[in-house]
């Protein structure tokens, strides 16, 4: 079923490695089609969160409708669905791609193919999308367009001889990209009279309308007043508004098969409108949902505590507000002896965690302390039950543990060939299991490893970058669980265990890690008037110790000359005081201490 209207629609997204110029290319397409006036154009239109602009990354998917008039007078609707490029947001990317028929693959002419270029490209291929390579940054003197074309053909195996050579920065050859979109990307198919079937590829919360669902209609149509059903949750709502993105919401009478747009239906929470869910009619239902939906799984957990305990309520509100727009964030209250009341939060990955923490501080003006991130371990107990452990302090006693499993990821690292040795050494140090390696071209290699997620969280990326002078790129996905010998490493300050500093480490590494942490903390914890022992312990046995020396307060300053016994009396008194102080004194732990645990040197 292919109507005349559908022949003039193209739905596509742009995929690329970080910094290859995806958002800039989107800006040029928007500008070229005259979608926004010059006054409304600001750079990176689709990255509208302050943080996105600052870090130069795309966090949320966005969509925009472009109208392109060809020279022969034909008018086409191009729906551009922008995707996040970072590996944490992999699932969001896959849902955005499922809403399209084609993808533009942007490759930097100076850098060639990188790990996420490949990862995103394979994702697009899994969705049977028509892939359109575009080579960007050809205005740079170091551009090597022809070699990059060969690379694309050899590695990805798609025809690249006619790939447009563009410069998104200067706007060179952007017209060619628009022509290629119309010529190469297939138009949507789908029966407008069939029962409604639409894919939610994103949702966001609007304080007036409730949840706004961004959808691609696959079959049927949707208009205000319709009763719809969300298939994953089974809930039924009445549609209050439908419309399109220009990039702001613009109401329309209806959306039909092939369209990309949004609808609102007084949905209260983003969790009810899950990304990847299928929307269908409440009465005239589709037989089965669109495939590929899965609930979002948190990979990394971290504790977030207010610096001022009285702000607990405000922190809760802040997290609730962020959660309304971010279904991947989950949190539950937890208490720590050291930090008081706070929340254990689950995130998609390290970048997601960073972004949320920064947004809490920025948008809600809260000072927070965050504990070192941890992954989910599975523990089989002797009584036959299996528990999931997200917080190291909740680890059951050793006598109750039968086995422990940790998450393993499939990591692919692309690096210049002269650094292969350094990268392999790093992966082996991190308990990586070598799978295979392929040469991409004579100078670049792709290495595949299975590595515990625990090791990746632990500054893997930073070390990888420094060992390869910033040239290597990394992509990973969860593979499954594998049993391992793990122990809990506790940190004691002044004889008291600080629960927020506990971490789970492989048994054979406990000693090194313990020593590293003790040394690191020694440099961070401020000196007090009494000395503070820092101890690392496993199962009650101390394995490393450092001491923060006491500051000396000169109690003899007011004695000029005079009798030695007078001085001795003052010194004895000071000694007594220090002893008492050590018993009741508490040690202030600065925020850096929690993060420093992650950064102990290799």
From Swiss-Prot:
It is an enzyme of class 3 (hydrolase). Residues 7-189 form the tr-type G domain. GO terms for cellular component: plasma membrane. The keyword Cell division does not apply. It is a peripheral membrane protein. InterPro entries: EF-4 (IPR006297), EFG_III/V (IPR035647), EFG_V-like (IPR000640), EFTu-like_2 (IPR004161), G_TR_CS (IPR031157), LepA_C_sf (IPR038363), LepA_CTD (IPR013842), LepA_IV (IPR035654). It catalyses: GTP + H2O = GDP + phosphate + H(+). The keyword Disulfide bond does not apply. Keywords: Cell membrane, GTP-binding, Hydrolase, Membrane, Nucleotide-binding, Protein biosynthesis. Its EC number is 3.6.5.n1. GO terms for biological process: positive regulation of translation. Its main location: membrane. It is found in: Cell membrane. It holds the Pfam family LepA_C. One of its GO terms (molecular function) is GTP binding. GTP binds at residues 19-24, 136-139. NCBIfam families: lepA, small_GTP. Belongs to the TRAFAC class translation factor GTPase superfamily. Classic translation factor GTPase family. LepA subfamily. Required for accurate and efficient protein synthesis under certain stress conditions. May act as a fidelity factor of the translation reaction, by catalyzing a one-codon backward translocation of tRNAs on improperly translocated ribosomes. Back-translocation proceeds from a post-translocation (POST) complex to a pre-translocation (PRE) complex, thus giving elongation factor G a second chance to translocate the tRNAs correctly. Binds to ribosomes in a GTP-dependent manner. This is Elongation factor 4. It comes from Clostridium kluyveri (strain ATCC 8527 / DSM 555 / NBRC 12016 / NCIMB 10680 / K1). The gene is lepA.
């Amino acid at each position: 079923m292919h109507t005349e209207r559908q022949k003039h629609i193209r739905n596509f997204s742009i995929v690329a490695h970080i910094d290859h110029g995806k958002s800039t290319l989107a800006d040029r397409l928007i500008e070229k089609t005259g979608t926004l006036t010059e006054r409304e154009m600001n750079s990176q239109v689709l990255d509208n969160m302050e943080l996105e602009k600052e870090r130069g990354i795309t966090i949320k998917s966005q969509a925009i409708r472009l109208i392109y008039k060809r020279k022969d007078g034909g008018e086409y609707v191009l729906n551009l669905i922008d995707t996040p490029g970072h590996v944490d947001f992999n699932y969001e990317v896959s849902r955005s791609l499922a809403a399209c028929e084609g993808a533009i693959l942007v490759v930097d002419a100076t850098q060639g193919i990188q790990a996420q270029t490949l990862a995103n490209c394979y994702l697009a291929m899994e969705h049977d999308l028509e892939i359109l390579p575009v080579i960007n940054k050809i205005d740079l003197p170091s551009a090597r367009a022809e070699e990059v074309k060969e690379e694309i053909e050899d590695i990805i195996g798609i025809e690249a001889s006619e790939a447009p050579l563009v410069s998104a920065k200067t706007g060179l050859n952007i017209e060619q990209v628009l022509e290629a979109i119309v010529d190469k990307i297939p138009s949507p198919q789908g029966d407008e009279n069939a029962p409604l079937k639409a894919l939610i590829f994103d949702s966001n919360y609007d304080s007036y309308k409730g949840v706004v669902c961004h959808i691609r209609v696959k079959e049927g149509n949707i208009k205000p007043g319709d009763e719809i059903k969300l298939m994953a949750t089974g809930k039924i709502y009445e549609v209050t508004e439908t419309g399109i993105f220009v990039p702001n919401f613009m109401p329309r009478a209806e959306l039909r098969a092939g369209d990309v747009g949004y609808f609102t239906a007084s949905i209260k929470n983003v969790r009810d409108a899950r990304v990847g869910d299928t929307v269908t009619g409440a009465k005239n239902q589709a037989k089965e949902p669109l495939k590929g939906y899965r609930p979002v799984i948190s990979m990394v957990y971290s504790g977030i505590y207010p610096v001022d305990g009285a702000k607990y309520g405000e922190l809760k509100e802040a997290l609730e507000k962020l959660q309304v727009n971010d279904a991947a964030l989950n949190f539950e209250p937890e208490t720590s002896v050291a930090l008081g009341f706070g929340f254990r939060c689950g995130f998609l990955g390290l970048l997601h965690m960073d972004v949320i923490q920064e947004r809490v501080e920025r948008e809600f003006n809260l000072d927070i302390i965050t504990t070192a991130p941890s992954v989910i371990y599975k523990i089989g107990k002797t009584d036959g039950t299996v528990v999931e452990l997200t917080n190291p302090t909740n680890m059951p006693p050793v006598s109750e543990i039968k086995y422990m499993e940790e998450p393993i990821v499939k990591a692919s690292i692309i690096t210049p060939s002269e650094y292969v040795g350094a990268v392999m050494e790093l992966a082996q140090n991190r308990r990586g299991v070598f799978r295979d390696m392929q040469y991409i071209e004579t100078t670049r290699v792709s290495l595949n490893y299975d590595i515990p997620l625990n090791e990746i969280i632990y500054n893997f990326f930073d070390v990888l970058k420094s060992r390869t002078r910033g040239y290597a790129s990394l992509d990973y996905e969860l593979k499954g669980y594998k049993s391992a010998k793990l122990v809990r490493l506790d940190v004691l300050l002044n004889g008291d265990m600080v629960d927020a500093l506990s971490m789970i480490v492989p048994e054979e590494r406990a000693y090194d890690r313990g020593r590293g942490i003790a040394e690191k903390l020694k440099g961070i914890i401020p000196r007090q008037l009494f000395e503070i022992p820092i101890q690392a312990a496993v199962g009650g046995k101390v394995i490393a110790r450092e001491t923060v020396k006491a500051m000396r307060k000169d109690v003899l300053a007011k004695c000029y000359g005079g009798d030695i016994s007078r001085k001795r009396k003052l010194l004895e008194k000071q000694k007594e005081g220090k002893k008492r102080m050590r018993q009741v004194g508490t040690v202030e732990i600065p925020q850096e201490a929690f993060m420093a645990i992650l950064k102990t040197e290799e």
